């Protein structure tokens, strides 16, 4: 504000100096005015003084209707001002044929009026969230919105009248469209404020307020989208692509699309709330905190969500108008369609798991029995290996193997082979864990297979030698023969 005063003072002194110079040098009124309108320096200083007057008037209106601005309002003003300034510069490039000295004051006036609309919207939002507001604040905000609506209507009427008189597209088309948007915005803000006052007079018990507010915003976005589309095509047909409208057109379309989707989802949820959300039982109200987290009041009747939290019916309905998540745990009130389609399968899976717990004993017994069968077969395999190893050990200790030159098979016996006449054929030695059966369980299958083949070779050699002993010494080897046969048969 201090910088504005300094700037205004310097501008005022410069304007007085140039006016004094014009009248002192020309001596008459008409030549002095011609000089002021033709001299570039004089014209710039006069336009600068007009800008200072408009800024001073803007601050006066702000002080009368709003008073001092809050920090959030100043931030909103700074953010929106730079964005609107860039859009107005783009608009100037489109309407460059109509650019003149009278065009700049109109553009600055439009920017300042837009700034007042931003402040009005932000102040109404602040009043709606403030518990206690003075009557003076209500009177000032109502008067401010009435003043803005009057200004919008006057400028819109002036622009439309100029269009009708000229009957051709000009910069008045741009101003008429902008003030039409501002007028509808002012009406929407005022109606929203009326909803707030009505709800306040009803002690916050007006259940239809969120519904009406939602419809109001939906209609406002629809009107803005329609006007943006019409203005876009009019400018495109007469001037070219309106670059300054692309962002506003996209944002308006996006907001309208979101509101329509929210509305359809809200109608889908609230159409069958009684069927979708069951009533909470007295036991559930007693077991949980019987305080509605939305309105912070005690609950005697409540609706239960899928997640298990309880809320008032009207509180839940008003909450679902803004978002479709639980206020407590942020879970979706209605799961997505893919989740709902997968839910029966999950329930069947859950039921199957419950049924599976009852039959888990039988299944476990079957698994254990099958495991027991495999363990029994493995135990029998180990037993055969142990028996073969025992037989090899018995025969290795009890038998005196004949020398190689005495071991000769009869050539007349079919299917027999001639034993080699090399030096004594000894059995390969293996460290077989005969006593410890757990040692076989720790061995790999390859190792067990090698051991089995080795023991089969041993048994074959033992059978041949046993047959040789039976043919040579039947009387003396009777008892060992029977013992060897029984052990060998057990090993097989």
Swiss-Prot record:
Cytoplasmic compartment segments: 1-3, 62-98, 157-170, 243-492
Domain of life: Eukaryota
Enzyme kind, highest EC tier: transferase
Biased composition (Basic and acidic residues): 470-486
Record's GO cellular component terms: endoplasmic reticulum membrane
Ranges of compositional bias, category Low complexity: 351-378
Membrane side Lumenal: residue ranges: 25-40, 120-135, 192-221
Sorted UniProt keywords: Endoplasmic reticulum, Membrane, Metal-binding, Transferase, Transmembrane, Transmembrane helix, Ubl conjugation pathway, Zinc, Zinc-finger
Compartments, as annotated in UniProt: Endoplasmic reticulum membrane
An example Gene Ontology biological process: protein ubiquitination
Lipid bilayer topology: Multi-pass membrane protein
EC number from the UniProt entry: 2.3.2.27
InterPro entries: HRD1_E3_ubiq-ligases (IPR050731), Znf_RING (IPR001841), Znf_RING/FYVE/PHD (IPR013083)
Entry keyword annotation includes Zinc-finger: yes
Transmembrane segments: 4-24, 41-61, 99-119, 136-156, 171-191, 222-242
Family note: Belongs to the HRD1 family.
Function: Probable component of the HRD1 ubiquitin ligase complex that mediates the rapid degradation of misfolded endoplasmic reticulum (ER) proteins, a process called ER-associated degradation (ERAD). Targets the misfolded LRR receptor kinase BRI1. Functions redundantly with HRD3B.
Protein name per UniProt: ERAD-associated E3 ubiquitin-protein ligase HRD1A
Native organism: Arabidopsis thaliana (Mouse-ear cress)
């Amino acid at each position: 504000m201090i910088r504005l005063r300094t700037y205004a003072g310097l501008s005022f002194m410069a304007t007085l100096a140039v006016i004094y110079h014009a009248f002192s040098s020309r001596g008459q009124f008409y030549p002095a005015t011609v000089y002021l309108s033709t001299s570039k320096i004089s014209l710039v200083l006069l336009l600068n003084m007009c800008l200072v007057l408009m800024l001073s008037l803007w601050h006066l209106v702000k002080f009368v209707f709003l008073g001092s601005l809050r920090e959030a309002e100043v931030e909103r003003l700074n953010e929106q001002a730079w964005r609107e300034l860039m859009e107005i510069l783009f608009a100037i490039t489109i309407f460059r044929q109509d650019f003149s000295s009278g065009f700049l004051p109109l553009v600055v006036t439009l920017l300042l009026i837009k700034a007042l609309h931003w402040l009005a919207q932000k102040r109404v939002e602040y009043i709606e969230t403030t518990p206690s507001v003075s009557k003076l604040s209500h009177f000032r905000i109502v008067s401010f919105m009435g003043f803005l609506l009057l200004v919008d209507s006057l400028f819109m009427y002036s622009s439309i009248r100029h269009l009708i008189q000229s009957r051709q597209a000009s910069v008045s088309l741009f101003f008429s469209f902008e003030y039409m948007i501002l007028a509808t915005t002012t009406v929407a803000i005022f109606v929203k404020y009326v909803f707030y006052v009505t709800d306040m007079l009803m002690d916050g018990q007006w259940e239809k307020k969120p519904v009406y507010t939602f419809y109001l915003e939906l209609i406002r976005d629809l009107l803005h989208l329609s006007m943006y589309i019409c203005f876009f095509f009019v400018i495109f047909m007469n001037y070219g692509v309106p670059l300054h409208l692309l962002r506003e057109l996209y944002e308006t379309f996006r907001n309208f699309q979101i509101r329509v989707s929210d509305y359809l989802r809200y109608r889908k949820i609230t159409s069958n709330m009684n069927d979708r959300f069951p009533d909470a039982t007295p036991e559930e109200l007693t077991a949980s905190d019987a305080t509605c987290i939305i309105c912070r009041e005690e609950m005697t009747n409540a609706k239960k969500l899928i997640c298990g939290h309880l809320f008032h019916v009207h509180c839940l309905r008003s909450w679902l108008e803004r978002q479709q998540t639980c206020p407590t745990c942020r879970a979706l009130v209605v799961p997505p369609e893919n989740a709902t389609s997968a839910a029966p399968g999950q329930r069947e899976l859950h039921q199957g798991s419950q049924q599976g717990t009852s039959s888990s004993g039988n299944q476990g017994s079957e698994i254990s029995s099958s495991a027991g069968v495999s363990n029994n077969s493995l135990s029998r395999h180990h037993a055969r290996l142990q028996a073969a190893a025992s037989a090899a050990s018995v025969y290795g200790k009890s038998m005196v193997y004949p020398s190689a030159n005495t071991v000769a098979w009869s050539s007349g016996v079919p299917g027999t082979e001639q034993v080699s006449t090399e030096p004594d054929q000894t059995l390969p030695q293996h460290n077989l864990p005969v006593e410890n059966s757990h040692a076989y369980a720790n061995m790999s299958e390859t190792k067990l297979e090698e051991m089995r083949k080795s023991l089969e070779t041993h048994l074959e050699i033992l059978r041949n030698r046993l047959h040789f002993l039976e043919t040579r010494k039947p009387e003396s080897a009777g008892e060992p023969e029977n013992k060897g046969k029984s052990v060998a048969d057990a090993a097989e």
